[in-house]
């Protein structure tokens, strides 16, 4: 996910473990890394405020993957998710492990108290242990696919090696005798590594407890009770992580009273929550004793990002809001963080607006900014609304939609470095809200003097698979907004200098309390919509993943609204996770009546809350709900006072009824038999991947108790069919596990593409293409490399469309095959019969699908009717696969209309067979024509390429493009850029993002141009001298503006009293050249003046009738370049631009050192 400047981790050479790796895991460890401490330590707050650290970015993705892992429905699904998790932990897209990244991030706020070798050893051991776990996972995957004595033996061996290594480096969470991840004085720096390693160890032990008997793990001597070890280590690892988190927390809290001290403390709390506490919160759900099946896990904690206020990214340019002179302080900032409160959901915000003024002119609004908030929130499954109030409220208000906001772009303003506010905010909503954006709009005065400066600050937590979240890929949503002063001095009476802070909850915290009939549903009790009198919310002790409910006497805990799937007539068992200093009786009431359970005390009064303080207790009586939504009331009895009862969550465990029948078995047998040839060694010619998945659905629906043997045999057969289907599929990642990866091939997609999983239509994943946005189509595509293809061969693209409108399917080789699908949503009804599997009776559903498909297969159709079929096939033929150009096959799916859409899956590209006869002759003729046209295009491209290359060569003085020609200016770079832009066939005409035949040379030249632009900007002592960033870094009066012509920006002085100026620094006593490219429009003169502190001055004058530096006479409306040599005697310099009349256009201003 992140891009990082620190140490690089190498990748292993193969995905399998050799015997040497297994025996000597850390010898020549390919995942070892040496930290670059100089780049990690003492990072200025200016470099990280309002920015999520690199390690925390990865941790957000890792934490979300862990949530998915806990809900994994099968061993196969679990293995796939864990492979993904390992990739993120060992490197992600940054190439660095979470161990490297977290240490570097923490060193920016925590003192280094150990030698670098201790940290290097910890990183190496962490990476090595995860590598050993991956070796174990490979053996588990092999055993799962082919369980036999050999695979079981290999699995046991690798399990024991990994288990021993985790024991060595984690030392059972000892606080006094730590292993390499718990060394003295390094515990806090290594804590994220410890938490991640502990999670993998617990996951390893969970597998042993669940599957170990089948491996023969428990036949060994001496006998080891891995279930007991798992339960014990969950507690030990939890307590260790919480202990050292709190140590760092308290150290930073005592560091000082300044705003800077608070920001460091706040960063620690936020990022260690993401890197450590979120992982720790999942530990309890790995206890196989309590969670033998998949579990819905929810994080209810709130992450508060840094306050939004104007920040000078250079300390030389002014005072930021947290500067000492502005009086923001630790206490006031910390007090603005809300106390624990209900886990409710944001509906909308009512934002109050007020003025920013100067004391000398209190009636003149310099800006109008965010003064206060009224967040309107609701409980889950409820229409009840209450308000959370912060800041100061005015009569000028704006109401902003608050549902499912995953990103906020704020504009902070600064008045004379003394008064602060937020004058604008754009709120990004997810796809369920139409991917819309809501805008709060204040006001910024832009005329006159003493106007505010503004700064854009983007606030979000990354998506699971993207640094910048999207409407489809995000991990957190906005839960609260807070307007605060933080102690800022108030320089103008009756006015408010303030900041804005955002709070975020994890997307796993569901807005609807839906009880799943197929897995355990955990619901944090902070989601109650009616809290009992006397109930308080208390802070997470560090391992809950959110706040707790507390009572000190008997009475109601509250009312929780839940949604049951009543059509299933499902039964559930109920249990709670709680801690109590006294014996209690808990009653639960709902449409099912009232059930009660005695709960014993778990802790002593006055003790700190630890993992062992909590117990999970199940009610003896199951329930069968009769209403949905239902109101669940929880009450604590009998009478007591001055005790402590804490309740974390309530859980619903489904009681699975028998739901199979003989006809389901017969339908499954028929579906499986239809997949194979008579000899059963291959798939029938016309069988598509969709048919294999649907047959597997029918088999999975069968009862293990009644049809265990039949189901086993059918599963083996259908798995064989699926393997055959996957083996022949030339498309990579047909399950859409990774989209827009950094790999060369694989799926690439635009915004508006989402992945859906489950449901009645697809066994695996499907893709959904939303409607296009104006001129931006929604698309997903993949290239099959030419090395995977055979010359003069026919290939077929297959898939299944649930429904679509204006779906275009293109197959491109050296020609294009185009298909349009408008498929009605006509397969099954919206209601599903009782006794269904996973909420859907898949056996009956498949019968309905089959009936519709039979009609499509046997009914004669015209072209319009064919476009409406759910299944599709498209054919394309290859030519001679000329090695001089990559002639792979592109498979493209796109929607270009604003009312189009599509849901499709089971995509495969398969070889049909070699061409022959007329088909072969036709392809040979087409291939000859295509080769001739390619030669013509290449000749034309080569001419343009040579001209562009020569122009770019002129920009540099060396072959490595590391030094710019001192004689060139921006005009030379623009001339070269225009030549590069004239190169054709850079991208495909089907989808702009697909490379064309000239993509590589275009990219080569563009990269060199980019280097030239970078060097041009770097050498210029004048900031923003090309005005590409508007008037940033310039002091400008009215009448000065920046305009744009194509890719060129230029300064315009439109009146004789307009002026811009800038102060900058140089090396004194060096030779510099002032070079200006400008044009004078109309009468009068334009001036660019340079001066130093010693009052040495030089001026370049421009008028409508002038000569350029080459002596060429120019006329009005022509840009020319002038230059003058200057030897500054002081460090500080000023440049000023003005004119006498008419208009003055300045393309660029350079002040470049030419000689030391």
Swiss-Prot record:
It comes from the Bacteria. The keyword Kinase does not apply. PANTHER family: ENDOTOXIN_N DOMAIN-CONTAINING PROTEIN-RELATED (PTHR37003), PESTICIDAL CRYSTAL PROTEIN N-TERMINAL DOMAIN-CONTAINING PROTEIN (PTHR37003:SF2). Residues 1-23 form a propeptide. GO terms for molecular function: signaling receptor binding; toxin activity. It comes from Bacillus thuringiensis subsp. galleriae. Gene3D superfamilies: Galactose-binding domain-like, Pesticidal crystal protein, central domain, Pesticidal crystal protein, N-terminal domain. This is Pesticidal crystal protein Cry9Aa.
